[in-house]
């Protein structure tokens, strides 16, 4: 028996009945009294029930010193490596949910033209600050906008790639958001996606305490099959999917062990938190290498119109 809790909740995505997964422990609020995670019996997508009040991503901790910046940049670069290798210098990349701007900066430093959108005003300002020391010639736009405003931002332009790095799990309207991103990509354009892997060894090991659940902000919870289905429904064909990318999800291991060092929840712990995450790279990389890492990284290609 999976759980004694009732299975009456309907999936908000496909409308099918669901089954109970677990009751998570929120990293900021402790064990919630009524929140539970369920998964559709048809589309397989997991979801937080009831829906979180605040689906915005937690503010990312900006690197505060040279050592921390180098470490954070290396982690981001490793995660994006599979996508960047498939692009040509000068290609346009849309960073959806740019946060503090570190990912957009890494892409710009590699010679791509970057259009970074971020709906949170404070994060948008931090992203602008992140770009202030870019070398001459770097091409990057930072715009305060959500996914639904992306067509207006692009104003008829198309991109060769888009990045949704830990964004899908926050979207109010999952399929509509993916469809909007697909609409600004050129035929054959690439989409790079990263989401927490709910079937990972880390999720099983930490159970309700796993950092990747984040029930106060994550509406959706994916495994490989459900992510494939969702992308396919928005006319993306998956070119590569799995946990074998970059260094895995070391922060998921680190902050599940020591939530007090999570810089998103406890500002001022950035260097210590990232140092712990770096120390967890061998653990995360081992899980990644055998296909059970905490982060699913996907490269998908947009179908021709």
PLM region descriptions:
Residues 27-29, 239-266:
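Conserved catalytic loop of SAM-dependent methyltransferase domains
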């Amino acid at each position: 028996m999976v759980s004694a809790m009732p299975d009456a909740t309907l999936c908000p995505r496909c409308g099918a009945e669901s089954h109970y997964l677990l009751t998570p422990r929120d990293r900021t609020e402790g064990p919630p009294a009524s929140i539970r995670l369920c998964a559709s019996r048809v589309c397989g997508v997991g979801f937080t029930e009831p829906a979180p009040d605040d689906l915005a991503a937690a503010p990312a901790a900006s690197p505060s010193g040279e050592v921390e910046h180098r470490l954070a940049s290396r982690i981001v670069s490793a995660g994006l490596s599979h996508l960047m290798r498939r692009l040509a210098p000068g290609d346009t990349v849309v960073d959806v949910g740019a946060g503090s701007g570190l990912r957009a900066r890494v892409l710009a430093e590699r010679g791509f033209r970057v259009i970074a959108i971020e709906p949170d005003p404070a994060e948008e300002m931090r992203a602008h600050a992140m770009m202030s020391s870019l070398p001459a010639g770097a091409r990057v736009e930072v715009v305060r906008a959500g996914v639904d405003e992306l067509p207006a931002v692009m104003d008829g332009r198309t991109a060769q790639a888009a990045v949704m790095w830990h964004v899908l799990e926050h979207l109010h309207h999952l399929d509509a958001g993916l469809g909007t991103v697909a609409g600004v990509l050129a035929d054959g354009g690439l989409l790079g996606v990263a989401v927490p892997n709910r079937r990972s060894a880390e999720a099983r090991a930490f159970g309700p305490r796993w950092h990747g659940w984040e029930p106060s902000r994550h509406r959706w919870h994916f495994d490989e099959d459900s992510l494939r289905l969702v992308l396919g429904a928005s006319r993306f064909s998956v070119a590569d999917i799995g946990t074998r990318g970059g260094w895995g999800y070391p922060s998921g291991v680190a902050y599940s062990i020591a939530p007090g060092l999570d810089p998103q929840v406890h500002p001022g712990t950035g260097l210590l938190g990232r140092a712990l995450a770096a120390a967890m790279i061998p653990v995360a990389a081992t899980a990644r290498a055998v296909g059970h890492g905490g982060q699913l990284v996907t490269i998908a290609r947009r179908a021709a119109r």
